From Swiss-Prot:
Signal sequence range: none
E.C. designation(s): 3.4.24.-
Species of provenance: Rickettsia conorii (strain ATCC VR-613 / Malish 7)
GO molecular function: ATP binding; ATP hydrolysis activity; ATP-dependent peptidase activity; metalloendopeptidase activity; zinc ion binding
Chain sites annotated for binding ATP: 195-202
Reported function: Acts as a processive, ATP-dependent zinc metallopeptidase for both cytoplasmic and membrane proteins. Plays a role in the quality control of integral membrane proteins.
Name by which UniProt lists this protein: ATP-dependent zinc metalloprotease FtsH
Compartmental location: Cell inner membrane
Membrane topology, Periplasmic segments: 28-103
Cofactor requirements of the protein: Zn(2+)
Record keyword Cytoplasm present: no
Cofactor binding comment, as recorded: Binds 1 zinc ion per subunit.
């Protein structure tokens, strides 16, 4: 029987016991179980000499009639009762009140509260620690992975080849240690997987468990610390003892930052239970006693908060970065997940990978699942590319809110706002290509223009950052040109925030301001408490930084205004098309502005050679370097 069944059975038994006990009291109560009559009726029967005998206990009278029937009644304070009974020849028996209750029942009543408390305590201890281990607080909660169920191998892991290679070496060592030992090599004692959420750290651990033919224990960092002092350290000792008994083996600790944070930051100056647990883990991983054959693999997305003693070689010999996949990695991941659904030939993993820069493996898996759900909702037998595009838009831009009743005025304003973003994006020399423009409300935005880089970008140059600022400001500029300064709305608030962040990064981090120079200003990140450290920038320098940020944003604003003023006719054309069609792809926008059919697939090198504006020539424009993070740029109204 499983734990849930035992729990239900225990509660049912307790409930039945209480009911039976209640019935005992009821059946044996002072007035229960017999024919109750009034005291007046009782006196009448006595006077009529129909009562043979009575048993008096306190004020309760149990009587027997001449015909053998029994009855109960309750007597008030009636001093002449005994005289009246004897005068009518009634046999009287008096029973002391305390002897009415039998010995067992009295014992049960006196000890029942204590027995109930003990029973509840034992029950909860069994639930917390399983099968009778009421005193097993210090036992490790590490679970030995079973061979039953689906097995995950390295074939199921894609897009993180470097991490796979490092971990494959550990698996090979466990399988055939002589291959490495003949050259004097030793198995790594520990391996730390570092990366943002959703990149596949836990999936890699599952693949190791599937590949290595050795015992595999898994535990969460939060499983060590309990409300009782010393339990965490005891569980660490027990976990390593299990590992030694099953060596060679692998122990996987997920979210190790829950127990491995910096020491010495306990609040109140008291002895921190988590700190004791960490100290025990440090000793077990690399102390006086050898741990041959026990490999520790841990995962975290917060390596900055881990104690330095935990990260040193000898404990975690390897730190493997599991980053978001590049375009090739995303394509491989998509192919793995596409195998699990039914799709037709229109679905191209490469195109989807290009349109999802910065996506983690978990996000790509969610995208494929969303596409399958959309196709099922529409009654399709297979997933097609349209479903994938709709799922991508849903993940990137939010759920389409077609139920919103927008007035014609709001719809027209949104169309010009998004048209301004798109048009300036086409004319900026270093802006990423326009992927889609829409005035269908999604998420918290009334409309959106999505730009996607042709390749993954890991850094940006000055021209790219200035172009991004101009595109951000273009929506507000379009509103001002078409509707006037007094009609500008708050819809550009998120655009202004994005432009300000880029401009401030140019000045304080990238050193792209001639006035401030190549000097880093601001904090380098949160401290161990998650707070921003004190800023060491002087007030005078802070004023200069603010002035430079304003200058850069104003420059981008004027640049966008110049483009939209010179190409006002194209802005009108694009806005009217958005009002009519609601959503336009980047190719459709180029076709529209170049006078071609909207769905023409001919190569279109828009914009044209126009001396009145900036000519976009990809071959002559400065070579694009790569951005710190593959970006998904959405410009919301």
């Amino acid at each position: 029987m499983n734990n849930q069944g035992r729990s239900i059975l225990a509660w049912a038994t307790l409930f039945i016991f209480v009911i039976l006990l209640f019935n005992v009291f009821q059946s044996d109560s002072l007035l229960g179980g017999r024919n109750n009559i009034t005291f007046s009726d009782f006196l009448t029967r006595v006077d009529e000499k129909t009562v043979n005998s009575v048993k008096i206990q306190g004020r309760v009278i149990e009587g027997t009639s001449n015909d053998g029937s029994t009855f109960n009644t309750y007597a008030p304070d009636y001093p002449d009762l005994v005289n009246r009974l004897t005068s009518n020849d009634v046999n009287i028996e008096v029973v002391p009140l305390e002897t009415r209750m039998n010995t067992f029942l009295g014992f049960l009543i006196s000890w029942f509260p204590m027995l109930l408390l003990i029973g509840v305590w034992v029950f909860f201890m069994r639930q917390m620690h399983g099968g009778g281990k009421a005193m097993g607080f210090g036992k490790s909660k590490a679970r030995l992975l079973s061979d039953k169920g689906p097995k995950i191998t390295f074939k199921d892991v894609a897009g993180i080849d470097e991490a796979k290679e490092e971990l494959t070496e550990i698996v090979d060592f466990l399988r055939d240690p002589s291959k490495f030992q003949k050259l004097g090599g030793k198995i790594p004692k520990g391996c730390l997987l570092i990366g943002p959420p959703g990149t596949g750290k836990t999936l890699l651990a599952k693949a190791i468990a599937g590949e290595a033919n050795v015992p595999f224990f898994s535990i969460s960092g939060s499983d060590f610390v309990e409300m009782f002092v010393g339990v965490g350290a005891s569980r660490v000792r027990d976990m390593f003892e299990q590992g030694k008994r099953n060596a060679p083996c692998i122990i996987f600790i997920d979210e190790i930052d829950a127990v491995g944070r910096h020491r010495g930051i306990g609040m109140g100056g008291g002895n921190d239970e988590r700190e004791q647990t960490l100290n025990q883990m440090l000793v077990e991983m690399d102390g006086f006693e050898a741990n041959e054959g026990v490999v520790i693999i841990a995962a975290t997305n917060r390596p900055d908060v881990l104690d330095r003693a935990l990260l040193r070689p000898g404990r975690f010999d390897r730190q493997i970065a599991v980053a978001n996949p590049d375009i090739n990695g995303r394509e491989q991941i998509l192919k793995v997940h596409l195998k699990k659904i039914k799709y037709n030939s229109t679905v191209l993993a490469r195109i989807i990978a290009r349109g999802t820069p910065g996506f983690s493996g978990a996000e790509l898996a969610n995208l494929v699942n969303e596409a399958a759900l959309i196709a099922a909702r529409l009654g399709k037998k297979e997933v097609d590319m349209h479903d994938m595009e709709e799922a991508k838009d849903k993940v990137l831009m939010g759920v389409a809110r077609r139920s919103i009743a927008m007035s014609e005025k709001e719809k027209r304003l949104t169309a010009y706002h998004e048209g301004g973003h798109a048009l300036v994006g086409l004319y900026c020399p270093a802006a990423s290509p326009i992927h889609k423009a829409t005035i269908i409300p999604r998420g918290n935005a009334l409309g959106m223009v999505q730009r996607l880089p042709e390749t993954d970008e890991y850094s940006q140059n000055r021209e790219q950052m200035e172009s991004s600022i101009a595109v951000y400001m273009a929506g507000r500029v379009a509103e001002e040109i078409i509707f006037g300064r007094n009609k500008v709305t708050s819809g550009a608030s998120s655009d202004i925030k994005g432009a300000t962040n880029i401009a401030r990064a140019m000045v304080t981090k990238a050193g792209l301001s001639d006035l401030i120079g190549p000097i880093f200003h601001g904090s380098s990140g949160d401290d161990m408490y998650g707070r921003q450290p004190n800023n060491e920038t002087s007030e005078a320098t802070a004023e200069l930084i603010d002035a430079e940020v304003k200058r850069i944003i104003t420059q981008g604003y004027e640049f966008a205004k110049d483009i939209l003023t010179k190409h006002i006719d194209q802005l009108h054309t694009l806005a009217n098309a958005l009002i009519e069609y609601e959503t336009l792809s980047g190719q459709q926008i180029k076709n529209l502005l170049s006078g071609r059919a909207l769905d023409s697939e001919e190569e279109n090198k828009f914009p044209f050679n126009d001396s009145s504006t900036i000519k976009i020539d990809k071959e002559k424009s400065p070579e694009k370097t790569k951005t710190t993070k593959a970006k998904k740029e959405n410009y919301a109204s």
